[in-house]
Design a protein with these regions (language model features):
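Cys-based phosphatases of the PTP/DUSP/CDC25 superfamily and their flanking regulatory architecture
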Residues: 1-316
Length: 316
């Protein structure tokens, strides 16, 4: 375990000397890599929550056959020969809710990692794009979103949704009432059969972390690490879709720490600066503040110390 201790000591020295802040500033030279033409097009400007946070054309997430626009970016991170794929996006607006769910459907993503509250300090950070009641599905133009279950924990909330394609969804929503005749029962059986058809239904977990102030850092290392490990546990299909308000600050920290935790689990080497550089080359400004960048290193020390103390025969 000498190597582990050396890694802890080296990282702690970086933190104590504020080398992480210097490292963060050195990343500022990464300028926008393309002109973000689609995001700046007049017809798409209202789809952006912030005027200065636009996805690159080369890494944006296209919608449908017409390659429609949403403020979202594919983030591919290479580390020790493995590739991790995510989607980083802004918190949906009222006018982009349909687009958001279309993105979820088309990418077959079964996990949405939400890193913000809807309102923070009196400001709207994210539109409530999901149904709050099991009895009141969210009906969109092409999809019906049904709340299947939810659980409120101390630092994050878990919601499970069923997405139904509209042509199937309309018939199934109408069958929620009581069956008074055999004709209705036959219709319901047909509806249930259609729901089992491949591609007609998609289940999604949304996990909303609520213990993180905007532009700040989480108040608990343990809560954040448990959140990420749960996210990994439930992830099955498609890229994890991560969003905060702008889709770069808290979202960037989440993706960076997730990659680091995966590396630690497999005893892989990792380089936080390299990870953040890769993210910024695919979505401008990932990890917004030096405090957020510094936090990534602090999480590493926290996890390494947990590993050290849980190893039989180890001593601090």
């Amino acid at each position: 375990m000498a190597t582990l201790r050396e890694l802890i000591e080296a990282t702690e020295k970086q933190i104590a000397r504020n080398e992480t802040f210097t490292e963060f500033l050195s990343l500022e030279h990464i300028k926008p890599l393309d002109d973000c033409i689609l995001g700046n097009a007049p017809q798409n400007r209202e789809k952006n929550r912030y005027r200065d946070i636009i996805p690159y054309d080369g890494t944006r997430v296209p919608l449908g056959e017409r390659q429609g626009y949403i403020n979202a970016s594919y983030i591919r991170i290479l580390n020790s020969g493995e590739e991790y794929v995510y989607i980083a996006t802004q918190g949906p607006l009222p006018g982009t809710t349909e687009d958001f769910w279309q993105m979820v459907w088309e990418n077959k993503s079964n996990v949405i990692a939400m890193m913000t509250k809807e309102i923070e300090n009196g400001l709207i950070k994210c539109h409530r794009y999901w149904p709050m009641s099991r009895n009141k599905p969210l009906e969109l133009q092409d999809y019906v979103i049904v709340l299947e279950d939810y659980q409120i924990l101390e630092t994050f909330t878990i919601r499970k949704f069923k997405m139904v394609k509209k042509d199937t969804g309309k018939r199934c929503i109408s069958s929620l009432g009581s069956d008074r005749d055999s004709g209705r029962k036959k219709k319901d059986k047909k509806c249930k059969a259609e729901l089992k058809r491949p591609g007609s239904v998609h289940f999604v977990h949304q996990i909303q972390f609520i213990n993180w102030p905007d532009h700040g850092i989480p108040t608990s290392f343990d809560a954040f690490v448990r959140y990420i490990r749960y996210m990994k546990k439930i992830h099955e299909t498609g890229p994890i879709i991560a969003h905060c308000s702008a889709g770069i600050g808290r979202t960037g920290v989440l993706l960076c720490v997730d990659v680091v935790l995966r590396a630690l689990e497999k005893d892989f080497e990792f380089n936080i600066k390299n990870i953040v550089t890769q993210m910024r080359e695919q979505r401008f400004g990932m990890i917004q503040t030096k405090e957020q960048y510094h936090f990534c290193y602090e999480v590493v020390v926290y996890v390494l110390r947990k590993i050290l103390t849980s190893t039989p025969g180890s001593t601090e």
